[in-house]
Amino acid sequence: MALGGGTFTSQNKELPGAYINFVSAASASAALSDRGIATMPLELDWGVEGEVFEVTNEDFQKNSLKLFGYAFDSPKMLGLNDLFMGAKTLYAYRLNGGGDKAANTYATAKYCGVRGNDLKIVIQKNADDASKYDVTTYFGTVKVDTQTVAKAADLVANDYVTFKAADLAVTAGTPLTGGTNGTVDGTAHQAYLDKIESYTYNTMGVVVTDDITKKLYVAFNKRLRDELGIKFQLVVYNLSADYMGVISVKNKVTDAGWSEAALVYWVTGAESGCAVNKSCQNKKYDGGFTVDTNYTQN
């Protein structure tokens, strides 16, 4: 019974008729699963080499210096800041590993890369015990570690350097030098794809401008989607892929020191966090890059 009869809850109705309650199970979430998981291969000045490593939004804000070599609000982190505006978790891979580690008489950088050249070791006599030294590690202008020891053998490796068995001597600051980034080539991109294939993520983004590398990623996307049933979206820059699994970003970035394809960061994050019953169409860009929007109607 509907309308005047009301909804049946107990045998207290006055109007005759059939009262039927329809109770359905809780509907499935439109999200289907936790979204906001992205993956990207990155060119970095510091960080883990040869492995996929997980970074959450919280990790990025709290441990960006340790993970990427720069504070999260550094201009060098502009791309990742854009990514984490939409993403919750990033599976990152460093493309340019395999370079040289910076070093000096007392220590060697934990990772290769030019950022290691901004490390320095300061050694002072301990104020309370003249037989001991205060050994301080600086990353840029940030003090990241201090240890008080009698000899170098007592020093423990920290998140930035490993120490050598050298004779300690007072120094106002001995910089580490010789750090270099590795070379990015097709082999590095393929190594990333081999590593990431076993992971689960919503969106993959790659910041490149050459069509050969873009097509390598498109082929990977098609194989996983069509042959293995693993559905994810690939974000690339300015490529007519004509495929439902690929998102092509047309607008270019004009900021000095950044690839014109850098808007891929923001789109990758936004798409990864977008629910399956929603769309990023007409979503306003609110990231930190300067975007070329000087287009005509045709």
Short names for language-model regions:
Residues 3-24, 28-47, 52-56, 60, ...:
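A glycine- and small-residue-enriched flexible loop/hinge signal that marks low-structured segments
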